[in-house]
Amino acid sequence: MNQERKQMLMSREANRLVLQRTIFLMVLFGVVIFLPLFWQLYRLQVVRHDELERRAVEQQTSELPISASRGTIYDGNGNVLAISSTVYDVIISPKAIAERQEELDKKKETAAKKGADTAPYDWNVENVVVTNLSQILSLDPADLRSKCADTKSQYKRLAQKIEKDREDKIRNLMESYQLSRCIYLQPNTKRYYPYADMAAQIIGFTNDSGGAYGLESKYESQLAGTPGLLVTAKNGAGTDLMNFFQDYYDPKDGNNLHLTIDPTIQNYAQSTLEQYCERYQTQNGGVILVMECKTGRILAMAQTPTFDLNNYSSVTDETLLSQIEKQAKEAVEQSEEEVKAALAATQEAGTTLSPEEMEVKTYEQAYQEAYANAIYKQWTNKCITDTYEPGSTFKAMVLAAGLEEGVISEDSTFECSGSVQVDTWTIRCSARSGHGHQNLAEAIGHSCNPALIAIAQKLGRQTFYEYLERFGIMDPTGIDLPYENVGEVWPYKDFHITQLATASFGQRFEVTPIQLITAFNTVVNGGYLYTPRVVDSITDPNGGTVYQADNTPVRQVISEETSRRCCEILEGVVSKYTGKNAYQPGYRIGGKTGTAETRKKNSGEYWVSFVGFAPADDPDVITLVMFDRPKSVDNYSTVTPRGDVISGGAMAAPVAGELLAKILDYRGFEKAYSSEDLTGSLTPMPDVHGMTEQQAKEIIFAKKLKYRTVGTGETVTGQLPDEGRSVPQNSTVILYMGEEMPSEYVEMPDLTGMTPKEAMEAMNELGLFMRARSASGYYTSSSVVTDQQAAPGEKVHRGHVYKVTFTDASGN
């Protein structure tokens, strides 16, 4: 019994062990088998959840981007310079075309069974679509028919950005044949530039990818906006189900740019530049910049050549087109010469040329290459990328540095013998015989190189170089335009005594036009260096301000007192010296001329320029006018074929003066005449006794005088004033024609309270002549007579000149 029990227990233990082992093996087997499955399930449901969900959505839906409306660009007066208008992309649904055909076929069959007219259904949908759309969109019919054959697709884009005329034709087609499910016009946007070439290099242009150049590129993130989405369902075959499910996400329109450019001033600058570039036959056009002195805002940025923003890949400039033809011919000739030279070399060496090496460039190939270069050239913003030697315009910065450092003053004197020796180099002055003894104002007015070298030497190499840096000559200005270049200046380690000398008169280093006007503006605006800019503000589609430009200067380079002293000296350059061609009566203009030979020495090629500012006593605007290589008679001439002298004073100064006068008038500045403006310089009265009126008129006008006659005789019998008596120019003299003769004396009128013009007319009427006087030296419409040399009612000699004193009645 005990033995049996013992065996039974042992059997149970054995079974239990077997069961445990079996369970363990089953569990182990289960773990081995199912653990990877559980891991894979975990990966699918947890680790890759987001990815798989996205892929599922992609397989089940289609996302069609909806273009956002690009922001508008406005000029400083709120006129639209660049705007996006709604245009349309043309899309067809081959599946819907096939379904429409099936629908027609069924209706035709039903009508035939009923004995009804089948003509309304007796046409082919695909033929109608292909025939009409290929004509409207100028597409290849065979290519369009192959697209229609893909009947599983519901989306085939045929054309992009069609305009209203073609849109209307397609809508008529859709309506006439009930093709609204077959043809779809998807809204898109197209960029338009209403003023075509106005400020073209500033604004830039767009392509299919967005902003490609200029502000359109620089501010792409602001202008572009955020596209919307049209989400539609797709079936298992991947076909769009446009009418089954749709979800529309609105696009967010782009922000708007508001520029500093004044359209009136920009047009002044562009038209003036084009006129004179044509006159001077400039080989590489020119530039005009206009900046607001106390803010750095760019009011105009003009250049030639330029282009039409609506057709930016076309060249229309006559000078560029002629250069393209010339360059193409030269390229072909050069290619022929290279092949000839290569053949000669191979014959000598006993080798041969490959067919490619023997190929001569065709005129068509050369023309296309030259045309592409011309397109790039007209896109280039010369104002911020081209570099040139500033020449004597840079002397304004040397003047400012010298006055600020106290190494010179208005009382400083300079000797000029016509040249100066610097190290082993003889540097000549423009006046080969020299200017002799001169003070500071005269030295700057004469643009005397030896005097400027002396100032630079007094400053010293280190201080001079520091001012190059402080005036911003070493760095980009930071203007808010892409691709700004920076000039070429010696590194300090290479800046020695000869470099110091040539730098003093603006040669052997280069700047961009924007660098030069920014530095010069610092000299005259109180000494403050501003960052130039063309974008004044950015607004959102609702008009809210996103960005407002800051007018804070970067730094003060010279004191306001030094700046005032510079303005006085530079005004003298215009009123008395090399810049006198910029002089405009009634306007106080200051400035500096510049003439520099290009990199091709002894080529007769020059950069001629002038920087002018006004009003000189409180500068409001500053302009840079630069002509790039006016055409000369020959390589050794400084005269153009039509006789213009190639120099900054002869070419650029009058253009700048004319432009500044227009700008000041436009901006509402009152004219302020000097006594010379008002009454002219004194001129001796000629003897016209016995002459006819016509003979006397010619002589009197040559003296810059006016006249009136008394009497009806044939010849002059008397005149006021007498022969040889000096009278102010612009005065009206009296010619007596006949027996009537003037009395010797006349009563002086009461001139109190009269304006300069009124006083002059009142005196001239009586045969008296006025010499104006004013405490400020200038006269405006607010100036009135407060004193007169001869008292009212006093007997005075006819034909004599009398002093009249004016005071500004406005209280300013």
Where are these regions (language model features)?
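Periplasmic/cell-envelope proteins involved in peptidoglycan metabolism and beta-lactam response
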Residues: 1-361, 378, 387, 462-474, ...
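Beta-lactam-recognizing serine transpeptidase/beta-lactamase-like catalytic domain environment
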Residues: 5, 82, 88, 235-248, ...
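Short, solvent-exposed beta-strand edge segments and adjacent coil->beta transition regions
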Residues: 87, 153-155, 252-256, 381-385, ...
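Sec-exported extracytoplasmic/periplasmic mature domains
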Residues: 134-138, 175, 207, 224, ...
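Acidic/histidine-enriched alpha-helical segments
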Residues: 143-151, 190, 282-295, 415-419, ...
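Short flexible coil/turn linkers enriched for glycine and charged/polar residues
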Residues: 196, 617-619, 729
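Ligand-recognition elements built from short beta-strands and adjacent flexible loops
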Residues: 495, 549, 586, 590, ...
